[in-house]
């Protein structure tokens, strides 16, 4: 094979359409735009989303408000009532809750919520506490220790 033997594959190089250069060219006179009308005029025929005068979809739908936060904090949550099964004076972490079978996953950082009653003194390590959870843990004689989010998610 020599350099002069190289040629493009058949059908790979199509000629550019020469529009409006006489009827023999196949695209003469109206240039493929049909007869009169808005779509045959110069410039963009209609705006994006135009539905022929019908009320368009973007105007039929309500304006959406209250979008969710883009970088919303996602937590693995647990209520203080579930911590009653743990032994007194123990340190509660994500790992200890997984080993005790109280949590099934540690995908997200831990947040302790305040539903239920707590009768056991515990040292709870979590990324976040609700106000009622913090008061219930401290009322039972326990300690709330806020850990960094990165430490919990590892």
From Swiss-Prot:
Residues 23-35 have a biased composition (Gly residues). Keywords: Ribonucleoprotein, Ribosomal protein, RNA-binding, rRNA-binding. GO terms for molecular function: rRNA binding; structural constituent of ribosome. Pfam families: Ribosomal_L27A. Residues 1-57 are annotated as: Disordered. Disulfide bonds: none annotated. GO terms for cellular component: cytosolic large ribosomal subunit. Coiled coil: none annotated. InterPro entries: Ribosomal_uL15, Ribosomal_uL15/eL18, Ribosomal_uL15/eL18_sf, Ribosomal_uL15_bac-type, Ribosomal_uL15_CS. GO terms for biological process: translation. SUPFAM superfamilies: Ribosomal proteins L15p and L18e (SSF52080). Part of the 50S ribosomal subunit. PANTHER family: 50S RIBOSOMAL PROTEIN L15, LARGE RIBOSOMAL SUBUNIT PROTEIN UL15M. Belongs to the universal ribosomal protein uL15 family. Binds to the 23S rRNA. This is Large ribosomal subunit protein uL15.
